[in-house]
Amino acid sequence: MEKSMQPIQLFELASRQAEWLSVRQEVVATNIANANTPKFHAKDVSPFEAVMQATSQQVGMARTNPAHLGESTLSENIAVRDNPVNNEIGMQESGNSVGLAEEMTKTGEIKRQYDLNASLVKSFHRMMLMTVKR
């Protein structure tokens, strides 16, 4: 029985997560920038797992070259939604629902996830280079 080499999906998965993290960071930065804007409601993006399930269920058109037809980007599948009001913070008198402490915590989470993503890609790339050199 002949074994064929399967394509390595780690780089694609890491790229998709990096794009999702970028969109999430943009949404969190918008929340922080509008912390004093009256009636602004904090937003967040759909979880990465939900985005991956949505993109995996889409059937793409077969093509011989990736440059021939533009594929929908992951960003189109990331839903930005209003955050539910945090009961600890509540709604401010101005109608604003942004909690700076919560948004800064999200920023830290995003940085940690991005650093882990970059470290995994770097380690896997190094491992592939060592394999090729042998």
From Swiss-Prot:
Places the protein is found: Bacterial flagellum basal body
InterPro entries per UniProt: Flag_bb_rod_N (IPR001444), Flagellar_basal_body_rod_CS (IPR019776), FlgB (IPR006300)
Alphabetically ordered keywords of this record: Bacterial flagellum
Keyword match Chaperone: no
Subunit structure: The basal body constitutes a major portion of the flagellar organelle and consists of a number of rings mounted on a central rod. In Gram-negative bacteria, at least four rings, L, P, S and M are present, whereas Gram-positive bacteria lack the L and P rings. The rod consists of about 26 subunits of FlgG in the distal portion, and FlgB, FlgC and FlgF build up the proximal portion of the rod with about 6 subunits each.
Source species: Agrobacterium fabrum (strain C58 / ATCC 33970)
UniProt function note: Structural component of flagellum, the bacterial motility apparatus. Part of the rod structure of flagellar basal body.
Cellular component, GO annotation: bacterial-type flagellum basal body; bacterial-type flagellum basal body, rod
Family membership noted in the UniProt record: Belongs to the flagella basal body rod proteins family.
Pfam family, one: Flg_bb_rod
Keyword Isomerase: no
Identification of the protein by name: Flagellar basal body rod protein FlgB
A Gene Ontology biological process term: bacterial-type flagellum-dependent cell motility
Gene this protein is translated from: flgB
